[in-house]
Amino acid sequence: MQIAEVMKKMVAYSEGNTHDINHLLKVWAYAKTIGELEKLDEKTQRVLEVAAILHDIACPLCREKYGNTNGKYQEQEGMPLAQEFLKDCGLSEDENERIVYLVGHHHTLGDSIYFCY
């Protein structure tokens, strides 16, 4: 599945929430640009872009379940949602694992070996 198809799937997942859609487009554009300027290899660039697209996948659930989108809730709820979302996206298992990890830690500060590819 191409990045554009992942984007289309995530926009559909967002069910017309223009705030969420605009945010994911902005974050994706920043991530894409930074990755290209850093001259990432193709696989790392793909992981970066898909993680950027999916990073707030848990926001709709968090709003419903907790009444807010607190970062810790997003991380907790986002990992299984991202894992399910990625099942039919045609990425390798290690790409999926990296993306799920990034979604589950995108509000966590600190150094991590897993942020290095």
Regions found by a protein language model. Name each.
Residues 1-8, 22, 42, 76, ...:
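Generic alpha-helical secondary structure signal
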Residues 2-26, 58-69:
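Active-site flanking loop/helix segments enriched in acidic
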Residues 3-9, 33-40, 55-61, 116:
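Short, mixed-charge, low-aromatic patches
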Residues 15-48, 83-89:
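Alpha-helical phosphate/pyrophosphate-handling elements in metalloenzyme active cores
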Residues 46-117:
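Divalent metal-dependent catalytic cores for phosphoryl transfer on phosphate-bearing substrates
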